[in-house]
C-alpha cells in the first residue's frame, strides 16, 4: 500500500468568523479599553533615542515587511512586530548597529504568538546576511521580553477589522476585497512612525474608510461613512477624518516612491550574492500593487 501526502499549503486551516463573537459589543469594548495600554506615550526619537532617527526606523520596517511577505507570515505578524519595536525603543536607548538585531527579534516573538509555524532563528540570521548570530538572537529575545514585561498579547489594528466590517454590512462579494485593501493600508501605516502613537482602532477605522471609498464598495457618501465608522469605535469624527486623509496621503507618497524606484536602473547585486537566496526587493509588493 502506498500513502500519498497532499499537504501542499503552508498555512494551517483557520476557523471561520463567529457571528456571535463579532456581534457582541462587549468584545469590541474590551479591545477598546485595552488598546491604549500598548501605544507608545511619547516620541522616543525626542525623549529616549540619540542615534536612531525616523528614516532608520522606516528602512528597518520595510526590511521586516519584506521578510514577512516572503515567508508568507500571517498579516498580523508584521504590525505586531512593529508594536514590539516601538514599545522597546520608547524605553531603552539603542545603538543604530543593534537596530536590525532588534527588528529580527521582534519578528521572532510576533511569529511565535501569531503563527502556527513561527519563523526560525536560523532563517532570520540568513535574512540579516549573517550580521546577527543565533546566540545574539536568543540573548536579545530574553532582553526584549524583559523590557516588555512579557506582555506580548498587544491589541493591534488588525484585531478590529473583523468587528468593524461585521457592523458595516457590506455586500458579501466586496467584503474580502475591502479587507485586503485595509490590511495593505495597515501594513503601510506600520512602516510610518507618524501612526505609531495613534490608537489601533482609529488606524483600523481609517483604513477601512479609505478602502471602502476608494473601491466604491457602498452607496453612502464620504461623510455618512465616516460618521458610521466613528460611531462603531467611538472615535471623534474629525480625528477619524484626519487619520483617513493621512493614510491616503501616505499611500500616494508610497506609490510615488515606488514609481521612482521602478524607473531607476536596477542596482548591481553584491559580490558573492546568489539568486537562490532571499530576494532583496526594495518596495513592499502589496503597497505598489494596490489600485484605488
Curated annotation (Swiss-Prot):
Main localization (coarse): nucleus
Every Cyclin N-terminal domain range: 27-152
GO BP terms: cell division; G1/S transition of mitotic cell cycle; negative regulation of transcription by RNA polymerase II; positive regulation of G1/S transition of mitotic cell cycle; regulation of cell population proliferation; signal transduction; T cell proliferation
Keyword field: Cell cycle, Cell division, Cyclin, Cytoplasm, Nucleus, Phosphoprotein, Transcription, Transcription regulation, Ubl conjugation
Superkingdom of the source species: Eukaryota
Biased composition (Low complexity): 272-285
Gene3D superfamilies named among the record's database cross-references: Cyclin-like
Phosphothreonine modifications at: 283
Cellular component per GO, a single term: cyclin D3-CDK6 complex
Coiled-coil residues: none
Pfam families: Cyclin_C, Cyclin_N
Cellular compartments annotated: Nucleus; Cytoplasm
Modified residues (Phosphoserine): 264, 279
Processing after translation: Phosphorylation at Thr-283 by MAP kinases is required for ubiquitination and degradation by the DCX(AMBRA1) complex.
Record GO terms (molecular function): cyclin-dependent protein serine/threonine kinase activator activity; cyclin-dependent protein serine/threonine kinase activity; cyclin-dependent protein serine/threonine kinase regulator activity; protein kinase binding; protein serine/threonine kinase activator activity
InterPro entries to which the protein is assigned, alphabetical: Cyclin (IPR039361), Cyclin-like_dom (IPR013763), Cyclin-like_sf (IPR036915), Cyclin_C-dom (IPR004367), Cyclin_N (IPR006671), Cyclins_cyclin-box (IPR048258)
Region span, Disordered: 254-292
Family: Belongs to the cyclin family. Cyclin D subfamily.
Complex and partners: Interacts with the CDK4 and CDK6 protein kinases to form a serine/threonine kinase holoenzyme complex. The cyclin subunit imparts substrate specificity to the complex. Interacts with ATF5. Interacts with EIF3K. Component of the ternary complex cyclin D/CDK4/CDKN1B required for nuclear translocation and modulation of CDK4-mediated kinase activity. Can form similar complexes with either CDKN1A or CDKN2A.
Function, in words: Regulatory component of the cyclin D3-CDK4 (DC) complex that phosphorylates and inhibits members of the retinoblastoma (RB) protein family including RB1 and regulates the cell-cycle during G(1)/S transition. Phosphorylation of RB1 allows dissociation of the transcription factor E2F from the RB/E2F complex and the subsequent transcription of E2F target genes which are responsible for the progression through the G(1) phase. Hypophosphorylates RB1 in early G(1) phase. Cyclin D-CDK4 complexes are major integrators of various mitogenenic and antimitogenic signals.
Name by which UniProt lists this protein: G1/S-specific cyclin-D3
Species name: Homo sapiens (Human)
